[in-house]
Amino acid sequence: MSNQDLINNKSKAGLTYAKAGVNIDMGNAMVEKIKPFIRATKRAGADAEIGGFGGLFDLKAAGFTDPILVAANDGVGTKLKIAIEVGHHNTVGIDLVAMCVNDLLVQGAEPLFFLDYFATGKLDPEQGAAIVSGIAEGCKQSGAALIGGETAEMPGMYAEGDYDLAGFAVGACERSMLLPSKNLTEGDIILGLSASGIHSNGFSLVRRIIEQNDLKWNDPAPFDPSNNLGVALLTPTRIYVKSLLPIMRKYEGVKALAHITGGGFLENIPRVIPSSLCAEINLSTINVPSVFSWIAKQGKIEETEMLRTFNCGIGMIIIVGQHTAEAVTQALEKNGETVTPLGILTKRQDQNKGILYRGVLHL
């Protein structure tokens, strides 16, 4: 055998990054697929072009004069397992953006830009493009530019077909408009904005109920016969930015917001009110969506557990002054929101209780 033959054989047997499970060409193919989605998120301050080592944003071009930057990051949780098993990937990106930008909104901030982290064991460009299309849609719904992200192909880290997502959002608020306000007081009105569904919390419990009842994702949804179970549960998280931000800027009486995520009312409302006040909530006023009634019944879940795990139909809380409540309610309804008067702020009697429930959930 000649020396050249030895070299050729050695070359054929040699390892490559692709043979180790990381295909750079696949990554490049995905980038080409997602560029149109990303360009569609262009806004003042960002050109929504990718490819640099860092994403750029011109804060001055966004029109702020004395801004405070606000940052948030989050994920989608085990709702992703349903998307993976159903093969429906184009809405979980909306969830990812929603979980971040709704948190920015609570501080009074306008979402400016978003970055994502997508990790998988083996990159499928079609799957990846579907995911990023959802992220771009969430960015459009919230007015944020998608200025960058990371796609990580990590063989051996994830089971076949599995992936995980994380999102990072940055917004800005004029210093004088930061929330919560320092003038929250007894008698302030608590309003609730309807959720679009389960949103992105509690899915480990939902999946356990599905398993215990031997249900299949393509079964008709018991709470929504027009959809199969998997698609119905994947209804994306509602993004409240475009309906709520103009109202927050117009009415000084908007004093605080709370994004109802993991922990429900109990964990989230006390985070935005002073320790001297208590949020008194009348549960009987909530029009509980049928999906939550179904979950409670199938899982034999008590009301207290439902309230600390799920949003139970209310995705965002707004606390407003008494004299502003009617005008804010009408403005929100005009912007397409369903508003529920939930209660009032009262003087806290027990220092360990920032929330007091009245009535019962109609599950």
UniProtKB/Swiss-Prot annotation:
Give the first-level EC class, as a single word.
ligase
Alphabetical GO CC annotations of the entry are:
cytosol
> Which NCBIfam families does the record cross-reference, listed alphabetically?
purM
Keyword DNA repair applies: no
Record's subcellular location: Cytoplasm
Keywords (alphabetical) are: ATP-binding, Cytoplasm, Ligase, Nucleotide-binding, Purine biosynthesis
Q: Which PANTHER family match?
A: TRIFUNCTIONAL PURINE BIOSYNTHETIC PROTEIN ADENOSINE-3, TRIFUNCTIONAL PURINE BIOSYNTHETIC PROTEIN ADENOSINE-3-RELATED
Question: Which organism was this protein described from?
Answer: Bartonella tribocorum (strain CIP 105476 / IBS 506)
Kindly list the GO molecular function terms attached to this UniProt entry: ATP binding; phosphoribosylamine-glycine ligase activity; phosphoribosylformylglycinamidine cyclo-ligase activity
What pathway annotation does it carry?
Purine metabolism; IMP biosynthesis via de novo pathway; 5-amino-1-(5-phospho-D-ribosyl)imidazole from N(2)-formyl-N(1)-(5-phospho-D-ribosyl)glycinamide: step 2/2
Q: What is this protein called?
A: Phosphoribosylformylglycinamidine cyclo-ligase
